[in-house]
């Protein structure tokens, strides 16, 4: 766990479509985010630690540390961009090309399938990159962790020289019910998880998962051993429940 004092000169203002308003800093080779609506930093840490026991490569997701920023809870992650690389979100990619808000365009479409196919086609035509496998991994994770804030500014590509590649999966803090205001912790977890609404293509994580299929596996035994060592929190309780709920994502050994 880290403790960092950061002056206001390191505050970075980012525009986007996220409902979150976390204070973000860039200092040295690290990004820092303060908690805002829940224990987002803890969630980022738990999710990235869990993914270490998955079939995803380390380069396919961002690793977060949990700690304190100016004595407030939060997290930090290393900058994943190499020199000369640029992160371009789906939102900005579309706006740069058409001058329109992609989320508003998708809202006009009637079905999840239309929205997904439109975005995949657009990114292919703009970047020459098929993002199907990337989205498959993202929505497998989002279903598992109940991500309530996947949007067009945390789905992204990276411009690397003269070609585009999928960005690593990042920004998972609004998950594990940490900031869901409708949750009642006097109720069982299985009741509270019903209060989750997914994004961005439809309100159901499972529908998006079934559209794409399974994106990765998790070493269930290793995760269970690790998670028991973590501090008892509601977020940990939800993650344990979700791992049991979607135990078909497990693999015996990685």
Kindly label every feature range from the protein language model.
Residues 61-64, 107-110, 197-203:
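Short C-terminal domain-edge/linker segments immediately following a structured domain
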Residues 80-139, 203, 215, 231, ...:
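ATP-dependent phospho-/nucleotidyl transfer catalytic cores
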Residues 38, 47-48, 59, 103-109, ...:
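A broadly tuned "polar low-complexity/structure-edge" signature
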Residues 35-39, 162-254:
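C-terminal catalytic region of ATP-dependent kinase domains
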Residues 1, 129-131, 253-254:
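Intrinsic structural disorder
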Residues 1-102:
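Conserved ATP-binding subdomain of kinase catalytic cores across diverse folds
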Residues 112-176:
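Conserved kinase catalytic-core segment
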């Amino acid at each position: 766990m880290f403790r960092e004092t950061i002056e206001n000169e390191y505050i970075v203002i980012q525009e986007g479509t996220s409902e979150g308003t976390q204070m973000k800093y860039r200092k040295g080779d690290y990004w820092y985010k303060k908690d805002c609506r829940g224990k987002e930093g803890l969630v980022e840490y738990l999710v990235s630690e869990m993914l270490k026991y998955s079939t995803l490569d380390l380069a396919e997701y961002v690793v977060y540390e949990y700690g304190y920023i100016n004595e407030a809870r939060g997290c930090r992650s290393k900058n994943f961009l190499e020199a000369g690389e640029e992160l371009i979100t789906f939102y900005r990619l579309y706006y740069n090309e058409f001058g329109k808000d992609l989320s508003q365009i998708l809202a006009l479409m009637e079905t999840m399938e239309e929205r997904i196919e439109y975005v995949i086609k657009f990114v292919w035509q703009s970047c020459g990159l098929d993002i199907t496998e990337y989205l498959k991994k993202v929505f497998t994770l989002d279903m598992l962790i109940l991500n309530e804030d996947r949007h067009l500014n945390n789905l992204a590509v990276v411009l690397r020289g003269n070609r585009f590649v999928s960005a690593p999966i990042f920004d998972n803090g609004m998950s594990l019910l940490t900031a869901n205001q409708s949750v009642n912790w006097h109720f069982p977890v299985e009741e509270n998880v019903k209060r989750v609404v997914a994004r961005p293509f439809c309100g159901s994580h499972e529908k998006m998962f079934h559209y794409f299929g399974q994106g990765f596996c998790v070493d269930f035994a290793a995760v269970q051993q690790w998670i028991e060592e973590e501090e008892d929190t509601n977020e940990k309780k939800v993650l344990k429940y979700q791992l049991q709920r979607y135990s078909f994502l497990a693999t015996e050994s990685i």
